[in-house]
């Protein structure tokens, strides 16, 4: 991990890429709830977060990059008040974009995520979004965003699960901004990243840029993405993040 200073013009070009999201067609989502949403030829893909995932148990080992390399996966069956894992966001030209990531949901659980902002001391719901399968994520887009002020937010699921953070104002008064540049997050090293997170917090960057290889779990992509987000959630919760 390292930080760098970039001028505002360069930063605008970077953030135009948007936030950790990609477009999928409606036909793709027609596979919703399928035990093998990627087809019978690829039963190993996302096997720990699709189908009857809760029966798979904790501690399953997943294939990593490189022949014969495996590592235990983090548990996906978490307490239901903890299913809202994390969220990433960017904003530019009056548009706020956010992607909330949930742990896998069980049959009968609500498939909606809710975005709230704190205004005048009160939490106000502004958007609802479908939780997509496979992947267990929800996208939010807010138009006419006032980027001149910090705004507390939280993303909720059900009655108790939530992830809170802060939408930072646009640092337009700065001639230079600080960008934290991180990459190559090993999946062989389980657990948190407390030293990295603490050092990044000390730098207090305006923008986080994860340049690639957020996970090396090459068949369990959702597990790897959730693992990465949980490792860095305390720095991504209150600043724009590009992955």
Regions found by a protein language model. Give the residues of each.
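Generic low-polarity alpha-helical segments
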Residues: 8-11, 30-34, 167, 241
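N-terminal export signals
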Residues: 10-32
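Divalent metal-dependent phosphoesterase catalytic cores across multiple superfamilies
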Residues: 36-243
């Amino acid at each position: 991990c390292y930080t760098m200073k970039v001028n505002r013009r360069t930063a605008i070009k970077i953030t135009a890429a948007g936030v950790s999201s990609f477009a999928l067609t409606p036909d793709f989502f027609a596979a919703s709830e399928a035990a093998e949403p990627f087809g019978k030829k690829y039963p190993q893909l996302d096997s720990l977060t699709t189908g009857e995932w809760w029966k798979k148990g904790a501690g399953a080992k997943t294939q990593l990059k490189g022949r014969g390399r495996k590592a235990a996966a983090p548990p996906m069956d978490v307490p239901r008040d903890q299913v809202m894992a994390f969220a990433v966001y960017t904003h530019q030209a009056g548009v706020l974009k956010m992607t909330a990531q949930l742990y896998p949901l069980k049959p009968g659980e609500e498939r909606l995520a809710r975005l709230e902002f704190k205004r005048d001391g009160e939490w106000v719901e502004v958007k609802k979004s479908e939780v997509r399968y496979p992947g267990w994520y929800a996208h939010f887009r807010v138009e006419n965003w006032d980027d001149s002020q910090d705004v507390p937010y939280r993303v909720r699921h059900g009655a108790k699960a939530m992830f809170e953070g802060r939408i930072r104002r646009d640092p337009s008064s700065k001639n230079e901004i600080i960008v934290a540049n991180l990459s190559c997050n090993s999946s062989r090293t389980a657990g948190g990243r407390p030293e990295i997170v603490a050092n990044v917090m000390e730098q207090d960057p305006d923008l986080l840029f994860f340049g690639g290889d957020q996970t090396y779990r090459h068949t369990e992509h959702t597990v790897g993405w959730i693992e990465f987000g949980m490792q860095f959630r305390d720095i991504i919760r209150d600043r724009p993040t590009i992955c």
